[in-house]
Amino acid sequence: MTIILGIDPGSRVTGYGLIKESDRKIAYIDSGCIRTSNDVELSHKLLQIYDGICELMDHYSPTEVAIEQIFMHNNPNSALKLGHARGVAMVAAASHRVKICEYSAREIKQSVVGYGAAEKDQVSHMVVELLQLNRAPQKDAADALAIAICHSHMRNGLSKLIGSRGTKRRRMRL
């Protein structure tokens, strides 16, 4: 059995999602958000993210961690803050000596929905379906679960099937 922690980093809200994988089947464990205080300096926000990820690592002992890669923001300051949040989340996971994999937003959407330009609500819907949840999790938690699901698919080669099927469809339309 593999426990995967998906992380959707953010300087204000960092989403997390935990799934377990056994015999190529996935199941929901937990999800939520690490919310940082508005009234503290960036360094303290980063410490809150670090502590939150470490707490999850200690409590659930995931064997693998997946995190979203940075995408370009229109605002360079936002991109830098996101990079800091992502960095401390990765350091927190690395301090527990687990494998960390990174995925682009397009890879995550392609793996979970089957379409790399899918909308957020489509991703959330598929997270609910794939994990057989009663309701959609919070936005950042749903994104983190999608990252964990993507990692499960990637490590089992399922994304290659999804990607090749999508390519064939595009070729047939030409």
From Swiss-Prot:
Known catalytic reactions? Endonucleolytic cleavage at a junction such as a reciprocal single-stranded crossover between two homologous DNA duplexes (Holliday junction)
- List, from the UniProt record, the residues annotated as the active site of this protein: 8, 68, 140
Q: Where does Mg(2+) 1 bind?
A: 8, 140
Family matches, as Gene3D superfamilies = Ribonuclease H-like superfamily/Ribonuclease H
This protein's source sits in the domain of life called Bacteria
- Cofactors named for this entry: Mg(2+)
State its Enzyme Commission number(s): 3.1.21.10
A GO biological process of this protein is:
DNA repair
Query: What keywords sit in the KW lines?
Result: Cytoplasm, DNA damage, DNA recombination, DNA repair, DNA-binding, Endonuclease, Hydrolase, Magnesium, Metal-binding, Nuclease
Q: Where does the protein end up?
A: Cytoplasm
Respond yes or no to whether keyword Nuclease is given for this record. yes
What Pfam families does this protein map onto? Answer: RuvC (PF02075)
The residues that hold Mg(2+) 2 are 68
Q: Please provide, in alphabetical order, the Gene Ontology terms of the cellular component aspect for this entry.
A: cytoplasm; Holliday junction resolvase complex
Q: How is the cofactor bound?
A: Binds 2 Mg(2+) ion per subunit.
Q: Name one GO molecular function term.
A: magnesium ion binding
Q: How does it assemble?
A: Homodimer which binds Holliday junction (HJ) DNA. The HJ becomes 2-fold symmetrical on binding to RuvC with unstacked arms; it has a different conformation from HJ DNA in complex with RuvA. In the full resolvosome a probable DNA-RuvA(4)-RuvB(12)-RuvC(2) complex forms which resolves the HJ.
What the record says about family reads: Belongs to the RuvC family.
Function comment = The RuvA-RuvB-RuvC complex processes Holliday junction (HJ) DNA during genetic recombination and DNA repair. Endonuclease that resolves HJ intermediates. Cleaves cruciform DNA by making single-stranded nicks across the HJ at symmetrical positions within the homologous arms, yielding a 5'-phosphate and a 3'-hydroxyl group; requires a central core of homology in the junction. The consensus cleavage sequence is 5'-(A/T)TT(C/G)-3'. Cleavage occurs on the 3'-side of the TT dinucleotide at the point of strand exchange.
Q: Protein name, please?
A: Crossover junction endodeoxyribonuclease RuvC
